[in-house]
């Protein structure tokens, strides 16, 4: 709130690039290794103090639905 749409959508240089040593790239197909099934395409990444490498995955079965997972929870799909 309080930002113009141009300000809210303006990219900030250097803040939103995938890490150089990223396990997965944007568009890679991945699935959860265990627990509730989730398979889809990597559409983003995140990092926190507890999760230095995490990914946003859009479901193949439910387009538009996105879940976030730490890298350790995911594996590449051929």
From Swiss-Prot:
Residue sites binding NADP(+) per the record: 32, 66-69
Source organism of the structure: Escherichia coli
Keyword Cell inner membrane: no
Cysteine disulfide partners in this protein: none
SUPFAM superfamilies, A to Z: Electron transport accessory proteins
Domain of life: Bacteria
The EC number(s) this enzyme carries: 1.5.1.3
Protein name from the UniProt record: Dihydrofolate reductase type 2
Pathway of action: Cofactor biosynthesis; tetrahydrofolate biosynthesis; 5,6,7,8-tetrahydrofolate from 7,8-dihydrofolate: step 1/1
């Amino acid at each position: 709130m309080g930002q113009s749409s141009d300000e809210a959508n303006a990219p900030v240089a250097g803040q939103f690039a995938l890490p150089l040593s990223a396990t997965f790239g944007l568009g890679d197909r991945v699935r959860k290794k265990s627990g509730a099934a989730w398979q889809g395409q990597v559409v983003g990444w995140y990092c926190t103090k507890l999760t230095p490498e995490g990914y946003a995955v859009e479901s193949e079965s439910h387009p538009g639905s996105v879940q976030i997972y730490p890298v350790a929870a995911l594996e590449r799909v051929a």
